[in-house]
């Protein structure tokens, strides 16, 4: 099983995986990787650690998808899967989207995260709203004969 857990920052993605993953499952969570690299804080990492964690995560995701094909159970936290979606779909991933109101997200950020997380939440919500907005369709005018 390959499960991609998505949602805004502070929506409960890591908590969901902690509650559902079994011992021995592969779990890819950026903050966990950053802490493994030496970050003293679970949610506030130096630039150097962030850069290494980004590279590690990219490699880990590709490897985990291959291990999933070999029968491993894989959980991936992915706030913004974008370009990775086709690979996830080809691998037969299931998707879980964590939701919370903006007020809940900001309350959690105030309780557990550095101040800059409020901006990250707002950026995510704007990106999500743009993705959900209907796109205007183009209309073609035809004359009575059906030609343009």
Name these PLM-found stretches.
Residues 2:
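Walker A (P-loop) ATP-phosphate-binding motif of ABC ATPase nucleotide-binding domains
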Residues 5:
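Hydrophobic anchor at the beta1->P-loop junction of P-loop NTPases
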Residues 8-9:
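The conserved Walker
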Residues 12-13:
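Conserved glycine(s) of the Walker
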Residues 16:
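Hydrophobic positions on the alpha1 helix immediately C-terminal to the Walker A/P-loop
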Residues 19:
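Active-site signature of alpha/beta-hydrolase-fold catalytic machinery across serine-
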Residues 22-90:
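Conserved nucleotide-sensing/catalytic segment adjacent to the nucleotide-binding pocket
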